[in-house]
């Protein structure tokens, strides 16, 4: 069955959820891309969404070390948008959270995508947090780099330095996917291009807070993308869309995209709630011979029930 794939950058609602920019669509029918009409900005008005909706945002390595669509997710963010209250919440899920994986026993929550693609990731997040997910968005390494470069870069206020001697050299196909190089991001106001922004949110070595700090940086970058992309409108989408080829994937259709964009301006700073499951909600330890993050469900469940009713 032919269906449009709306491809996004980290949750783009030009304001919603603080997750970043507009949805950046790439329309594909089967494996063949189609083009967007020049008349797109003049499409008939569409009814804005009235009911709350939840989107699972996924970020993965997409290099030659892995089988396509069977990757571990490096970033998982659950986003809920309530048009009625004009409130949005984004919850960063630790990739090493030790949970039951449907049909696979206990494992890291990031394995859901590896075992079952986007549907597998949705199943494990829904069953773990007792939430309903309406749609998903997946973005690979090169997709994020392209989006940010097309926006002319982003401005980020770096509060803690990032010093990583073991950053993977796997972005380009002509590089060894198993090599490493040094990455250094110093504190202060910084303008980042796509590669620099990716390094900032992907690096996980040399930070005493580990993946928790990386989750905070990912949310920070999405807010920076939102601020940079706030000038975009539907007329810009054809140019943006032409740059992507399977590097961003989603289940959100065109009409729903337009409806979401129509309410984007209703969301801003105080109405955007950011949650990271740092201790005491979680604790680090070992299971099955590997480093994992253990959830404290007595603390997490009330938090999730309140944020994702």
Residues covered by each model-derived region:
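Non-catalytic, solvent-exposed segments at the cell envelope interface
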Residues: 1-309
